[in-house]
Regions:
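Beta-sandwich strand segments
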Residues: 123-133
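Short, compositionally biased P/S/T/A/G/V-rich stretches that sit at domain boundaries
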Residues: 1-23, 135-144
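Extracellular acidic, Ser/Thr/Pro-rich low-complexity tracts
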Residues: 12-17, 27-38, 47-51, 119-121
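Exposed beta-strand face motif in extracellular beta-rich ectodomains
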Residues: 25, 109-115
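Solvent-exposed loop/turn segments flanking beta-strands in beta-repeat/beta-sandwich domains
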Residues: 32-45, 52-61, 67
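Aromatic sugar-binding surface patches on proteins
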Residues: 70-102
Length: 144
């Protein structure tokens, strides 16, 4: 059996902070496998910047987790934001870094993105992809 992505939930529009703060946008995907949830190896997405015709994060997968938010993914205490472990809903809190960060790698790019989701099971079989389009807006209040 092949894994399935039943649904994907993410904002359609994200306003990037204008200062040096960071906000977190929760992304979820409900996955199903006829062999059971234990047969799902991973759920995740890649982020494609439409205007730049390029993948962000070096094209690497951004993993979603079905861990109930109990596992620290990055120190000191960053968790997935997943609500309930082992319920088939995989989650990740995507960091959105403000324009005021002096390190360019900590400034979230603005523009149109296709978030391309898929799931893979334990036999390395892939689900069909689901594409979610999101707009990251420049949120600079100094122009108002």
């Amino acid at each position: 059996f092949i894994p399935q992505l039943v649904s994907v939930s993410a904002s359609d529009t994200i306003s990037r902070p204008s200062d040096n703060s960071v906000i977190f946008e929760l992304v979820t995907a409900r996955a199903h496998d006829a062999n059971g949830l234990n047969d799902i190896r991973r759920v995740g997405f890649v982020s494609y910047h439409v205007e730049w015709d390029s993948f962000l994060n070096k094209g690497n997968l951004i993993n979603l987790y079905d861990d109930g938010g109990e596992v620290v993914i990055y120190e000191p205490n960053f968790t997935s934001g997943d609500l309930n472990a082992n319920d088939g809903i995989f989650s990740f809190r995507v960091p959105v870094f403000g324009a005021g960060n002096t390190d360019p790698s900590l400034q979230t790019k603005t523009g149109t993105f296709n978030w391309i989701f898929d799931a893979m099971d334990m036999s390395n079989t892939y689900s069909d992809t689901v594409i979610h389009r999101v707009i990251v807006e420049w949120n600079d209040l100094s122009y108002i």
